[in-house]
């Protein structure tokens, strides 16, 4: 196993522990707690994949961080902060919406680009809106936390979420996953609309009816992929 992979995991475990302490002392906001829960699942998945104990990894990560801080100067910190752009956190969904349990009568799912696409194929003739929580860097979607599809009465009928045990995803991965989700839902004559944030930061444009600018041919192609590959 690559030593850098192990070191990265150990440091991530310790930094998560520090963030958890802040949360326990009520020193963070809702997006911070949201990311904390998601990252906990991701660390458990990575730990299982690597065969490493989280508690032991956290202690080793503490040693690594302490060694780095001993040699770090305030001037180096200032330079690093000044040269690193900070991502913004976009929230279409409330904590209740992003954490609510939901169930599928006719479950379908597909893995694409480190993302899991889930949808209920029993949903028909509904008006559906896509909402997402994600980080933005350089005015473009950087990391998806969660995307969910809601009916007009608030029922959750589909979801896209990162797979904890897999490496990160790109903006193109997210766009492809959304295309698969839209294609699958539109197959049953549902009307899909993406939130303004998804339109702006995933595609960078908006079309006239407020839906994501996905050509009909691509939607049909994505729908066929759902039928044949899921």
Curated annotation (Swiss-Prot):
TM stretches of this protein:
none
Q: How is it modified after translation?
A: Upon interferon induction, ISGylated via host HERC5; this results in the impairment of NS1 interaction with RNA targets due to its inability to form homodimers and to interact with host EIF2AK2/PKR.
User: Region (Disordered) spans which residues?
Assistant: 208-230
Q: Which domain of life is it from?
A: Viruses
Motif Nuclear export signal — list its residue ranges.
Answer: 137-146
Region annotated PABPN1-binding, chain positions:
223-230
The segment annotated CPSF4-binding runs over 180-215
User: Where does the UniProt annotation locate this protein?
Assistant: Host nucleus; Host cytoplasm
* Residue ranges annotated as motif Nuclear localization signal: 34-38
**Spans annotated as RNA-binding and homodimerization:** 1-73
Give a yes or no for keyword RNA-binding in this entry: yes
The record, for InterPro entries, names: NS1, NS1A, NS1A_effect_dom-like_sf, uS15_NS1_RNA-bd_sf
Write out the entry's keywords from A to Z. Answer: Eukaryotic host gene expression shutoff by virus, Host cytoplasm, Host gene expression shutoff by virus, Host mRNA suppression by virus, Host nucleus, Host-virus interaction, Inhibition of host innate immune response by virus, Inhibition of host interferon signaling pathway by virus, Inhibition of host PKR by virus, Inhibition of host pre-mRNA processing by virus, Inhibition of host RIG-I by virus, Inhibition of host RLR pathway by virus, Interferon antiviral system evasion, RNA-binding, Ubl conjugation, Viral immunoevasion
Q: Which GO terms describe its biological process?
A: symbiont-mediated suppression of host cytoplasmic pattern recognition receptor signaling pathway via inhibition of RIG-I activity; symbiont-mediated suppression of host gene expression; symbiont-mediated suppression of host mRNA processing; symbiont-mediated suppression of host PKR/eIFalpha signaling; symbiont-mediated suppression of host type I interferon-mediated signaling pathway
A single GO cellular-component term from the record reads: host cell cytoplasm
GO MF term (any one): RNA binding
Tell whether Cell division is among the UniProt keywords: no
Q: Name one Pfam family in it.
A: Flu_NS1
Quaternary arrangement and interactors, per the entry?
Homodimer. Interacts with host TRIM25 (via coiled coil); this interaction specifically inhibits TRIM25 multimerization and TRIM25-mediated RIGI CARD ubiquitination. Interacts with human EIF2AK2/PKR, CPSF4, IVNS1ABP and PABPN1.
| Entry's free-text remark on domains | The dsRNA-binding region is required for suppression of RNA silencing.
Family of this protein = Belongs to the influenza A viruses NS1 family.
Q: What exactly does this protein do?
A: Inhibits post-transcriptional processing of cellular pre-mRNA, by binding and inhibiting two cellular proteins that are required for the 3'-end processing of cellular pre-mRNAs: the 30 kDa cleavage and polyadenylation specificity factor/CPSF4 and the poly(A)-binding protein 2/PABPN1. In turn, unprocessed 3' end pre-mRNAs accumulate in the host nucleus and are no longer exported to the cytoplasm. Cellular protein synthesis is thereby shut off very early after virus infection.
Report the protein name in the record.
Non-structural protein 1
**Native organism:** Influenza A virus (strain A/Tern/Turkmenia/18/1972 H3N3)
């Amino acid at each position: 196993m690559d030593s850098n992979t192990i070191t990265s995991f150990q440091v991530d475990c310790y930094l998560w522990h520090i963030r958890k302490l802040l949360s326990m002392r009520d020193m963070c906001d809702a997006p911070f707690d949201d990311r904390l829960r998601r990252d906990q699942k991701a660390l458990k998945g990575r730990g299982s994949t690597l065969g490493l104990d989280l508690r032991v990894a956290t202690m080793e990560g503490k040693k690594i961080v302490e060694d780095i801080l001993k040699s770090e100067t305030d001037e180096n910190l200032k330079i690093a902060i000044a040269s690193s752009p900070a991502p913004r956190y976009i929230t279409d969904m409330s904590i209740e919406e992003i954490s609510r349990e939901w169930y599928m009568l006719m479950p379908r799912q597909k893995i694409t680009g480190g993302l899991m696409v889930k949808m209920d194929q029993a949903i028909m003739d509904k008006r559906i809106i896509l909402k997402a929580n994600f980080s933005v860097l350089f005015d473009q979607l950087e990391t998806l936390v969660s995307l969910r599809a809601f009916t007009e009465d608030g029922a959750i009928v589909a979801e896209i979420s990162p797979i904890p045990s897999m490496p990160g995803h790109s903006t193109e991965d997210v766009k492809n996953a959304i295309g698969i989700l839209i294609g699958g839902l539109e197959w049953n004559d549902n009307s899909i609309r993406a939130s303004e944030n998804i339109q702006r930061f995933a595609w960078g444009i908006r079309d006239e009816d407020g839906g994501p600018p996905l050509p009909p041919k691509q939607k049909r192609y994505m729908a066929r992929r759902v039928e044949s590959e899921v």
